[in-house]
């Protein structure tokens, strides 16, 4: 785009079209400060299974995900802020509007590390950075379909089917929460144990392996969960 930095009206118009300013102000609420938060998320699945919920560990982790941001970036933007004090005004990313158009088909592109969603007319409506497949659960090939969508799912750890974590050789139910193995969303595919899901660690998307085949940030997985429905096709590209 060839807007001059002095063209204030033009810049405002372009920003409004794309969803407004890059940043917004946000006032921390008593609910934000209260949580509840967990002190830390254990690595071990046996210990995870004993918790009531795999919640966020801090106000900054919760707010970073709510505003589609890296947690360290949120802290760097607000070096003086006391995030635990209700009424504190912080600067957050203004991520624009959520996509609301229903999805007709999805492409999971391993080469580009990207999930793309298309509407019924074939227009691309969303593109999300993704981690696709792992050594434990290589991603499927060909075309599959969404079978169901679960928000805030618990996770069944079954060492006989998927992978083995530590010394855990029994089936475990891992409680729900944004810091669970599949984050806060599970979009099941018609191939058993495979799905599109969230992540406990958004900074590793596109870099680390996925336990359920296609991993997105929790915020992208939540957006996608609201616009997909059972029967939507998911095509895997190498």
Q: What is each residue range found by the language model?
A:
Residues 46-64, 103-104, 173-177, 184, ...:
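Second-shell loop/turn segments in exported
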Residues 1-5, 58-84, 123-126, 219-222, ...:
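LysM (lysin motif) carbohydrate-binding repeats in extracellular/periplasmic proteins that recognize
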Residues 1, 27-68:
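Primarily a LysM-type cell-wall glycan-binding module
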Residues 100-199, 230:
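Gly/Pro-biased beta-strand-loop elements
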Residues 184-227, 233-235:
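Active-site scaffold segments
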Residues 1-33, 75-106:
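Extracellular LysM carbohydrate-binding repeats and other cell-envelope/extracellular binding modules
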């Amino acid at each position: 785009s060839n807007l001059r930095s002095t063209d204030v009206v033009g810049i405002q118009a372009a920003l409004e079209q794309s969803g407004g300013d890059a940043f917004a102000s946000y006032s921390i609420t008593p609910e934000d400060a209260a949580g509840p938060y967990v002190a830390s998320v254990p690595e071990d699945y046996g210990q995870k299974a004993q918790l009531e919920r795999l919640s966020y560990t801090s106000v900054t982790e919760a707010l970073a995900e709510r505003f589609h941001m890296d947690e360290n970036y949120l802290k760097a933007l607000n070096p003086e802020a006391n995030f635990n004090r209700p009424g504190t005004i912080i600067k957050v990313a203004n991520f624009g509007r959520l996509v609301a158009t229903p999805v007709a088909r999805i492409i999971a592109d391993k080469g580009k590390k990207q999930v793309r969603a298309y509407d019924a007319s074939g227009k691309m409506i969303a593109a999300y950075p993704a981690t696709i497949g792992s050594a434990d659960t290589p991603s499927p090939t060909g075309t599959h379909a969404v079978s169901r969508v679960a928000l805030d799912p618990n996770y069944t750890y079954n060492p006989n089917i998927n992978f083995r974590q530590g010394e855990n050789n029994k089936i475990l139910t891992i409680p729900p929460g944004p810091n669970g193995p599949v984050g806060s969303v599970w979009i099941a595919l018609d191939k058993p144990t495979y799905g599109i899901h969230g992540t406990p660690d958004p900074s590793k998307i596109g870099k680390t392996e996925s336990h359920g085949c296609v991993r997105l940030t929790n915020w992208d997985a939540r957006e996608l969960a609201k616009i997909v429905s059972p029967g939507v096709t998911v095509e895997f590209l190498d």
